[in-house]
Structures are given as structure tokens and as C-alpha cells.
């Protein structure tokens, strides 16, 4: 059990939550909450962290125990979390790597292009809306918000797992 905020894993998760550079360098990002954990592709998950309180949920723990995981003392988990009221579960995931072919390769692709979009909540909502509209993938300019920002991840409500995305230098 992890019992200290000085634990290296805890420090790293805090960095992944706060720093785009850390997410890019490590190729990892954090997704919090039951829904985001439940929808995450298993092959993206590097490790799961569960608060001590949540270990009493047998259904959740049955899912968690199939993956690498650690139990975290509740007070430490609150420090790791990017949200005001943590749900008690977070996953560190490997950032997927997509190509232009992944986005344009299907029959009659519908591509969404985002240029200079800065607000994380708006970015996630737009991705979610795009998925609902049948978008096959997203191209983002390098000046857009980091799609693995925790606020973007939360606001996609899982769409980020199902829709390929690629950063490009320019859209022209």
C-alpha cells in the first residue's frame, strides 16, 4: 500500500496531471474515475491506483485485479487526484500513437480539424460531439491544448479512447 505523497509513483502521477512536458516525454497520461477506468482499453493501461476505501467494492476490485495495481491510502489518493472530489480510482495509460492513415484510411472519412483550441473543457466536449456526429478522426494543430490534459480527458467522457487523433504542424 502506498502511504506517502513522497512515494515516487505519487510524485510522477502529480507531474503527469500537471505538466504537458511530463506526459509527452513519458508517453503517458492519467484518467480518473470509474467511467474513464471502465472504458479504457486494457492494452493502454500501465497501472491502476485505487483508494483504500474503494477496495471494499468487490465488483470494481475484480476488474482492477486483472491489471497491475496499487492501493493508496485515502489521504494520499486525494493528493494524487486532479479533481476536487476524487472517485477513488485512476489509471495511468499509455498515450496511443496514430498516423494520418488511421484517420483518413476508412471509407468516406469525416475528419474534424481543430486549430489553436486552448480551453481543455471545450476541447473534450468538441471531441465527444465529434464522435456523436460520426467523425472518423481529429487533426489538431500543435498550438491546441494537450489532448491528454486531465480536464480534456474527463470532458471527453471516453471519446478519446475511440477516436484517433493526430497533431499536425498546420492545417493548410
Labelled PLM ranges:
Residues 64-94:
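Glycine/small-residue-rich loop that forms an oxyanion/phosphate-binding "nest" at active or ligand-binding sites
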Amino acid at each position: 500500500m502506498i502511504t506517502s505523497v513522497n512515494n515516487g509513483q505519487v510524485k510522477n502521477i502529480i507531474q503527469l496531471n500537471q505538466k504537458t512536458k511530463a506526459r509527452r516525454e513519458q508517453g503517458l497520461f492519467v484518467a480518473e474515475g470509474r467511467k474513464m477506468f471502465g472504458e479504457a482499453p486494457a492494452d493502454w493501461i500501465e497501472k491502476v491506483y485505487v483508494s483504500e476505501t474503494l477496495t471494499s467494492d468487490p465488483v470494481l476490485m475484480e476488474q482492477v485485479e486483472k491489471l497491475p495495481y496499487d492501493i493508496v491510502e485515502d489521504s494520499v489518493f486525494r493528493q494524487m487526484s486532479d479533481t476536487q472530489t476524487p472517485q477513488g480510482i485512476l489509471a495511468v495509460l499509455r498515450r496511443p500513437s496514430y498516423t494520418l492513415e488511421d484517420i483518413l484510411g476508412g471509407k468516406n472519412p469525416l475528419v474534424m480539424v481543430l486549430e489553436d483550441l486552448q480551453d481543455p473543457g471545450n476541447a473534450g466536449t468538441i471531441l465527444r460531439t465529434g464522435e456523436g456526429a460520426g467523425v472518423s478522426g481529429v487533426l489538431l494543430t500543435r498550438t491546441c491544448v494537450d489532448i491528454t490534459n486531465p480536464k480534456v480527458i474527463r470532458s471527453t467522457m471516453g471519446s478519446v479512447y475511440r477516436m484517433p487523433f493526430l497533431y499536425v504542424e498546420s492545417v493548410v
